[in-house]
Amino acid sequence: MNILFDVLNIYYIPQYFPVWRELKKRGHNCSLIVYSKKNDKNLLASTLENLDISYTWVHDDSEAKDLYLTQKPDWIFFGNEFAFLDEIHQKSKTVQMGHGVGPKPSYYRKSDTPMTVRFMEGEVRLKKIEEMYPKDKFVQVGFSKLDPIFDETEQGLDLAKLGLDPSKKTILYAPTFNPTSLGCFPKNWPSEFSEYNILVKVHSLTLSRDRYKKDQERIQAWKQYSNVYVAGVDEFSLVPFLKTADVLISEASSTLFEFAALDKPVVICDFYDLKWSYKGIFKYRFAKRFGADSVIYKELGAHAANYKKLKPIIQDEIENPKNYKNNRRKYNIDHVGPTDGKASIRIADYLENN
């Protein structure tokens, strides 16, 4: 089979990669289609080369559509909606597979334009989306992004090579893009957590857009501390960081589900800033994007009401990692699905059988 993966954003690749790996192992022809309008071509070219994956650049979805209609692949994977499905479906079958399992209603609404099949993660999510779109095809497979951790092919980070102390416990701080707690952390916060390694993995947009200079300056200040490693924009995969860390700090990211699926403690920041587009007269946008019907993190792990309360909570979660074990197990079944490292195998089986 000829199978293409639509890479609107570079952070789709960690979700696609385990599936690409399984399909290549079975002898299928696979390639990434990467959008230069959304991704820095110069910055990412060497990263894509290092992945040893075949790829083609297109400017936007219109150019991608033309390529798909010309190549007529058997299957095309999408991480979001796509505007030209009526034309595409005359030539190819399509897959929708989200890059995260976060709380945004858009997780469900991207199925407003149905694809041939959508691969789903947990039981609750499957049930909900089947109720919303009873005529469409959904198949529960799990969360392929985490397969390399569960099948133990992901080795994680070498802390010593990063200049960190392997004898220390490691915190992963992975703030969301919007809302974000990033601005609520002082420039000297690594000094207050000196007994820990700190891995900082922020959204690629925060690092790459000029409008976020203040955030970038704050991150650069953290980078100067010997117990901190800040991931570069080229390190688009969170998976090695998830594998390595002992505890996660975030606020509204699907990373919370992913880390909890590894049965490791998460600490949820109830303090954060909103971008201007969600403030004042635009606050309705925030309610719409994180609506009352969306998934919440209320019982997934410990919550910190403000920055000052964060450290004792971190310490308690590291010393008592079983605090929320039962909650994590339930969230995992409901939202992430099977954690046997075989989501990609189930996906490949489905494509071959259909």
Feature roles, as predicted:
Residues 4-152:
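Active-site and donor-binding regions of nucleotide-sugar-utilizing enzymes
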Residues 55-60, 229-233, 299-310:
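Short acidic-hydrophobic, aromatic-tinged amphipathic segments that line or gate anion-handling sites
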Residues 67-69, 111, 192, 240-241, ...:
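Structural alpha-helical scaffold elements that stabilize or flank donor/cofactor-binding regions
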Residues 76-78, 88-96, 233-282:
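A donor-sugar binding/catalytic signature common to diverse glycosyltransferases
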Residues 114-183, 207-208, 323-330:
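A nucleotide-sugar donor-handling region in carbohydrate enzymes
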Residues 140, 254-335:
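Catalytic binding pocket for nucleotide-activated donors in carbohydrate/polymer assembly enzymes
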Residues 165-244:
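Donor-nucleotide binding loops and adjacent catalytic segments primarily
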Residues 339-354:
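C-terminal alpha-helical cap of glycosyltransferases
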